[in-house]
């Protein structure tokens, strides 16, 4: 079905997509977060009639607009890459993956495009109520956009609601509701959007503390800090809660990712969660006998509680997942990776025989081949795997990025608590050390978001679609040099856009709120 493709092409195509996604995610969470904060500020203006809140909301809207424009540009490039660099993927599952993206474009993007114009240019031209509705609908459009994009991503992590049609060599959607409301999608949506609110709150607090540092616009800065810190605290706590739900879904649907997140090689009942650990760089393969840790501190039984909601449950490690033989929750015995690979190869062979028999008009042979294909279709993607060790993601990257995300998530809760205490009980405007802490927390918000996506995407390698299609089989057959060229062109373009956004934002921040 898929010709052999040079690994360097795979690596460069992955690098290009990762580059685009990383840059795009610089802008998206700030859009989601600022939308809520400026909506709350305009709501206060609508209810009180105090023009101070109108001016405050307009200032943050200005920064929202700058960020929104750059985010749209990078997002469009990201969607085009599915067709240019990942054509096998697009052909194989385009009927399913394309549906949520189409809905996102038709519904959410047009909602944003319509109401953002009213939000920016409708002051004193439409009623206060209609303008307020436009502001919230702009934010709602961005959130709906995130929903459908995350539905598409969640489907790649946990493919449901589809059936493979051997006549077209495509997966076709049979249950839209299952795709749109899968537990993986629901948890991913809330966790991701709430993390965007956290970043937006950090950004507003940080910029406001810069004004306090400069002894400018004290009332504006303190009022912005209070609104943003409350949003941030609620979002950070809820993000931790939804993160627990996401981890549970990973344990159920992507056990290899969970094992990589914990550097967990040998399964056991009552498995502990690594609170702190340093991986052994000498550990090269799962079965090399090298201790995976130089040191670690565990919370007893916490991984079993997290992954199965049972402190004594068995959690399979990397070696268990490769070797099989343990008992699954339904009472069946887990297959080894080698057995899954063999069954995947049977599925691919049966598919080829089916296509040949259909072309020759041999219905009897086609029926036999189709039966074999149906029986082994759950392992179809494994047929492209050459070595069982390919099924193990990058453990150090996944392990450390997970801890970066979790540690920073805990720090953000503490940060917002301290900010609120100082804003209400102390004179925050005079605490210059806190101003610097707030400013330095801004990049930490971005790092936490990128770390989360590194866990989500790198932790499911080698799969483009979990258990169904590996990255090596999803790619377009392109000239490696052309991918390298566009990689560096995108790197230059995105860097220019990022520098432009930072420059325009800094200019707007220095100018300050209108008086």
What are these language model-derived features?
Residues 2-515:
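Polytopic transmembrane helical bundles with strong interfacial aromatic enrichment
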């Amino acid at each position: 079905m898929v010709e052999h493709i040079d690994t360097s092409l795979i690596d460069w195509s992955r690098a290009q997509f990762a580059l685009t996604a990383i840059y795009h995610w610089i802008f998206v969470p700030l859009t989601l977060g600022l939308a809520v904060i400026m909506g709350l500020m305009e709501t206060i203006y609508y209810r009180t009639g105090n023009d101070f809140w109108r001016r405050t909301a307009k200032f943050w809207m200005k920064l929202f607009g700058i960020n929104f424009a750059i985010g749209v540009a990078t997002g469009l490039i990201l969607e085009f890459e599915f067709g240019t660099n990942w054509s096998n993927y697009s052909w194989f599952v385009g009927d399913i993956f394309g549906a949520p993206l189409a809905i996102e474009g038709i519904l959410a993007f047009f909602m944003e495009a319509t109401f953002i114009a009213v939000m920016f240019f409708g002051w004193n031209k439409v009623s206060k109520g209609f303008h307020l509705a436009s502001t919230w609908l702009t934010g709602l459009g961005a959130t709906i956009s995130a929903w459908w994009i995350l539905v598409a991503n969640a489907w790649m992590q946990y493919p449901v609601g589809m059936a493979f049609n051997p006549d077209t060599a495509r997966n076709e959607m049979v249950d839209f509701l299952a795709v749109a409301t899968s537990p993986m999608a629901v948890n991913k949506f809330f966790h991701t959007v709430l993390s965007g609110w956290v970043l937006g709150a950090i950004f507003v607090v940080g910029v406001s503390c810069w004004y306090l540092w400069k002894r400018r616009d004290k009332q504006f800065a303190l009022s912005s800090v209070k609104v943003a810190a409350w949003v941030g605290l609620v979002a950070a706590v809820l993000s931790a809660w939804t993160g627990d739900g996401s981890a549970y879904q990973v344990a159920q649907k992507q056990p290899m990712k969970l094992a990589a997140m914990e550097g967990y090689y040998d399964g056991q009942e009552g498995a502990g969660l690594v609170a702190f650990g340093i991986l052994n760089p000498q550990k090269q393969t799962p079965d090399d006998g090298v201790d995976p840790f130089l040191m670690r501190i565990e919370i007893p039984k916490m991984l079993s509680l997290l992954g199965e909601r049972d402190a004594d449950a068995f959690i399979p490690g990397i070696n268990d997942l490769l070797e099989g033989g343990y008992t699954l929750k339904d009472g069946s015995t887990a297959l080894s990776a080698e057995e899954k690979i063999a069954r995947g190869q049977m599925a691919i062979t049966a598919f080829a025989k089916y296509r040949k028999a259909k072309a020759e008009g041999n219905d009897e042979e086609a029926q036999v081949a189709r039966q074999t294909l149906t029986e082994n279709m759950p392992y179809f993607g494994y047929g492209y795997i050459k070595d069982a060790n390919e099924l193990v993601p990058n453990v150090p990257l996944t392990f450390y990025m997970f801890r970066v995300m979790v540690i920073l998530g805990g720090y953000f809760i503490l940060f917002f608590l301290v900010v609120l205490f100082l804003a209400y009980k102390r004179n925050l405007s005079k605490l210059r050390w806190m101003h610097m802490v707030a400013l330095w927390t801004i990049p930490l918000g971005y790092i936490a978001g990128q770390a989360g996506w590194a866990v989500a995407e790198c932790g499911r390698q080698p799969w483009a679609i979990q258990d169904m299609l590996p990255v090596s089989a999803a790619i377009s057959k392109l000239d490696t040099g052309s991918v390298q060229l566009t990689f560096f062109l995108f790197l230059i373009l995105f860097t220019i856009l990022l520098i432009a956004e930072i420059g325009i934002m800094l200019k707007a921040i220095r100018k300050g709120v209108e008086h």
